[in-house]
Amino acid sequence: MSRCRVGAAGMLEGADCAVVVIGDEQKSDVWIEDCTIVMSNMHTMAASLGLGSCWIQGRSREAAEGGTTEDFLRTILKFPENFRLEAILSLGMPAVKPAAYELETLPTDKVHREFFGG
C-alpha cells in the first residue's frame, strides 16, 4: 500500500494500521465532505489515544507506478466503481513527540480579522 501515492505514503510500509476512507457517490452528493469529517474525527481520536496518525490524501492523486491512487487501492481492496477514495489514515505509535508550538512563534500572516487582509 505504500506505493499507492507519489511521495507521500512511505509511512504506510511500517504503519501498524491504515484506514482507507471511501464514499459512495451514488448515495450522497456530499461524499467528499462526509469522508473529510470522518477523517478529521479519526485523526483527533487517534491523538487523544496517544497514537500517531497521518492523513494521506488519496482523491485526485497519482500512484507511484502511474495511474491514480484510487485505482491502485481499488485493485487491492476490490471496492466498486461507485465508491470513491478520499484519503487514508495511517496509524501507529509515534517515534517522537514534538514539543508544542509557542503561540508567539507562529506566523500570523495567514490570520485575518473581520475581513480578508484585515
Task: Label every model-predicted segment.
Residues 1-118:
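Acidic, surface-exposed loops and disordered segments
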